[in-house]
């Protein structure tokens, strides 16, 4: 009986130890590198990304359609397809408000009316967690009356440099425990800019990919020197990749369309065409069969793209072949994205390392699953979304 009693007490004690270990606080850091192709790490010298692959999860993300910056960054933090969260393109027209959402217009860009869903910083904040966000698209918008605990306005000058943002993340992690955020997110606009200007295989793009890699090497060293280093889950990802566009690879459509049919045309990968009442068939028939593109009515977009149920999507969509732009102006050579996620050129980076991640090479997965993953890491209840942690549970310890 004495032995049984001791065994029972030992079991209870072990259970307590196990609970206290599993309840040990883990922090989550998510960094987005705009326009970082999943295979840049194969083309260029990226020792930091290689180290992450050797220690943790090596994968890639399949972007949501269209493979553009704002729709995908907002998908990453809500788990919703652009069609469901409302940021259906970088630039779009809203029939209900009669206004255009544009990245170049700070007032429209920060208008909460456009942002649906429950961004991760709101999900976390409601469940008593602290958040700090450095320039993630949508983080300076008052979605559902709330901001992250710490955030920065992207259009306010002087803008924090990429290095200052990385420094800021380290500063947040070094705060006393009571003030330290549970979730820290950061956004870097490179290598996207260079990818556009010089193409994915341009010398300057390679130089920027390698510059970002060395910045991250330094960032990681500083992170590893913190007392909480072993309690940090670090995710490095991107919103989309980058495809090569050759000079002259443009599909002009304007000359085929009558003014009296049109309200507005927004974007060039894809082009969203907003038409006057009763003119959808005229526009569709005028464009159907053009070279280097597919033309769809809004309600006939292939189901796999999860696009077209939102009223902000054009009445007619012109979706170009990889490497082509829908525009009258001659295309310059360089890089572009927005294309169908079936093309691996627009697939994005995913790396993760930390106490909750296995060392594993995992197939590319849909980026709607990232919100669910972050909720899981933070131990919080997720809001309704289009992803599912079960799709990627294999990457977790």
Tell where the protein language model's regions lie, with residue ranges.
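Metal-dependent active-site segment of extracytoplasmic phospho-/sulfohydrolases and closely related
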Residues: 30, 48, 211-252
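A long, amphipathic alpha-helix that forms part
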Residues: 162-174, 191-232, 374
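Loop/turn elements at helix/coil->beta-strand transitions in domains of secreted/extracellular proteins
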Residues: 24-29, 54-58, 126-132, 178-184, ...
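Active-site neighborhoods of enzymes that stabilize oxyanions during catalysis
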Residues: 265-376
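Active-site-proximal alpha/beta segments of enzymes that process anionic O-linked groups
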Residues: 25, 40-57, 61-178, 370, ...
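Bacterial Sec-dependent N-terminal signal peptides
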Residues: 1-26
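Structural recognition of the beta-strand scaffold that forms the well-ordered cores
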Residues: 28-32, 39, 59-62, 75-77, ...
């Amino acid at each position: 009986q004495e032995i049984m009693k001791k065994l029972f007490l030992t079991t209870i004690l072990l259970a307590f130890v196990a609970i206290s270990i599993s309840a040990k606080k883990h922090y989550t850091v998510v960094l987005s590198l705009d326009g970082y192709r999943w295979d840049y790490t194969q083309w260029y010298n990226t020792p930091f990304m290689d180290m992450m692959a050797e220690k943790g999860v090596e994968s890639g993300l399949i972007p949501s359609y269209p493979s553009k910056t704002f729709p995908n960054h907002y998908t990453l933090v809500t788990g919703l397809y652009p069609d469901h969260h409302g940021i259906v393109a970088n630039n779009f027209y809203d029939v209900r408000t009669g206004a255009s959402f544009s990245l170049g217009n700070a007032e429209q860009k920060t208008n909460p009316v456009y942002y649906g869903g429950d961004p991760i910083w709101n999900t976390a904040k409601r469940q008593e967690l602290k958040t700090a966000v450095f320039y993630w698209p949508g983080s300076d918008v008052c979605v559902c009356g709330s901001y992250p605990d710490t955030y920065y306005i992207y259009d306010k000058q002087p803008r924090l440099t990429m290095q200052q943002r990385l420094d800021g993340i380290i500063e947040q992690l070094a705060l006393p425990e009571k003030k330290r955020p549970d979730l820290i997110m950061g956004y870097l606009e490179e290598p996207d800019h260079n990818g556009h200007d010089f193409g994915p295989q341009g010398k300057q793009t390679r130089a920027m990919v390698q510059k970002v890699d060395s910045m991250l090497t330094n960032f990681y060293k500083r992170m590893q020197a913190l007392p909480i280093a072993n309690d940090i889950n670090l995710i490095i990802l991107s919103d989309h990749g980058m495809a090569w566009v050759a000079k002259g690879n443009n599909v002009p459509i304007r000359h085929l369309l009558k003014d009296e049919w049109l309200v507005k045309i927004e974007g060039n990968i894809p082009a969203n065409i907003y038409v006057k009442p009763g003119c959808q068939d005229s526009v569709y028939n005028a464009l159907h069969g053009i070279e280097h593109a597919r033309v769809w009515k809004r309600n006939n977009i292939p189901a796999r793209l999860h696009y077209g149920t939102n009223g902000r999507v054009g009445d007619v969509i012109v979706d170009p072949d990889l490497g082509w732009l829908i525009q009258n102006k001659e295309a310059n050579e360089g890089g572009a994205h927005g294309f169908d996620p079936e093309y691996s050129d627009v697939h994005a980076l995913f790396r993760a390392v930390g106490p909750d991640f296995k060392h594993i090479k995992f197939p590319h997965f849909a980026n709607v699953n990232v919100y669910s993953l972050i909720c899981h890491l933070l131990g919080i209840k997720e809001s309704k979304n289009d992803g599912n942690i079960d799709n990627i549970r294999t990457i977790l310890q």
